[in-house]
Amino acid sequence: MIAFLVLLSLAAVLQQSSGTVDFASESSNKNDYQKEIVDKHNDLRRSVKPTARNMLQMKWNSRAAQNAKRWANRCTFAHSPPYTRTVGKLRCGENIFMSSQPFAWSGVVQAWYDEVKKFVYGIGAKPPSSVTGHYTQVVWYKSHLLGCASAKCSSTKYLYVCQYCPAGNIVGSIATPYKSGPPCGDCPSACDNGLCTNPCKHNDDLSNCKTLVKKHKCQTEWIKSKCPATCFCRTEII
């Protein structure tokens, strides 16, 4: 049997392998598939080359999973509206996978990660037209909350959706989805097997917060309100 795997605008044909599973079984074992998804993401994040000094450990988030499920049930092979992808004040990113047969979640995540074959750290996609956004979202250092869901849309159409909070793939930084260096180099006292466990609880609203804080410190309420991560997270990953 041939399985058709689609990643956004990229279509590829895969041979059926041992990675295929019964969809009902995969969907019903909620705790099992949550652990499989989180463990797979963290394993891949630990294995990046070059290694990452600021890679956060991912954890499951039920709100992100609910948002992913609502979108998966629409059976639409397109990204959900950004305003529907939020967890608290965090905006979330999204990866989508479609197949003509069910896949194990570990296989879905691996397919996204495999775009690394056309990605060069510090340069970006190579050749430039290559699709690599799924890979960069999987390994985006700051994305640490994860929620995923799937839907059987027809006998030959299965949709898988993961949402990542806060969102990755920030314009201007896509070529460096994390900071290279020794594992946990930026979090030596908050490290779990190569991944940082100290995410900042705040999120900056401006892209130039480091410059603003360096120049003006955090002396005004405006800067503190717009740049809370830079102002208040001195030892956490931001």
UniProtKB/Swiss-Prot annotation:
Kindly give the Pfam families that the UniProt entry links to this protein: CAP, Crisp
Q: What residue ranges are annotated as transmembrane? A: none
Q: Where is the signal peptide?
A: 1-19
| PROSITE patterns, alphabetized | CRISP_1, CRISP_2, SHKT
Looking at the record, the residues that make up the ShKT domain are 200-233
Where, subcellularly, is it found? Answer: Secreted
**Highest taxon of the lineage:** Eukaryota
Residue ranges of domain SCP in the record: 38-164
GO MF terms listed in the record are: ion channel regulator activity; toxin activity
**Cystine bridges:** 75-153, 92-165, 148-162, 184-191, 187-196, 200-233, 209-227, 218-231
What does the function comment of this entry state?
Answer: Blocks olfactory (CNGA2) and retinal (CNGA1) CNG channel currents. Does not affect neither depolarization- nor caffeine-induced contraction of smooth muscle.
Q: Name it.
A: Cysteine-rich venom protein pseudechetoxin-like
| Organism (species) | Pseudonaja textilis
